[in-house]
């Protein structure tokens, strides 16, 4: 069975995850997998901790897609690619970003961000689809 990329650590308001064509409400402890689309409503926010200790915090009205995530807990090797389709995302990088920042990227509808720091905020405007 596939291991989750991470878990929801904080959830406020209306937050859902779309996985394999099904949409479910999110609560603290909900696993997040590669391919999941996490959405926050206008009253929602969500904090996700990935298995390399990366912290992703999506603000109200956001849509976040986890495109790729791989992390080896023995060697700390891995990669992360996520897309912020709309809204805001605060990021504190974990072990992958600290040891191999070239392996961490975030996309928006208009740009691809390569990471060289450890904390940053991304905003994407648009319809999020």
Please give the residue ranges for each predicted region.
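Flexible, surface-exposed loop/linker segments and immediately adjacent secondary-structure boundaries
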Residues: 1-38, 42-129
């Amino acid at each position: 069975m596939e291991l989750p990329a991470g878990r929801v650590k904080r959830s406020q308001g209306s937050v859902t995850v779309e996985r394999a064509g099904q949409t479910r409400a999110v609560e603290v402890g909900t696993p997040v997998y590669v391919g999941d689309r996490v959405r926050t409503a206008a009253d929602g926010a969500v904090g996700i901790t990935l298995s390399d200790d990366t912290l992703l915090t999506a603000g109200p009205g956001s849509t976040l897609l986890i495109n790729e995530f791989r992390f080896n807990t023995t060697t700390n090797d891995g990669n992360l690619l996520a897309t912020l389709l709309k809204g805001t995302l605060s990021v504190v990088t974990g072990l992958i970003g600290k040891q191999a920042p070239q392996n961490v990227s975030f996309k928006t509808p208009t740009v691809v961000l390569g990471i060289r720091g450890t904390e940053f905020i991304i905003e994407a405007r648009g319809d999020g689809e």
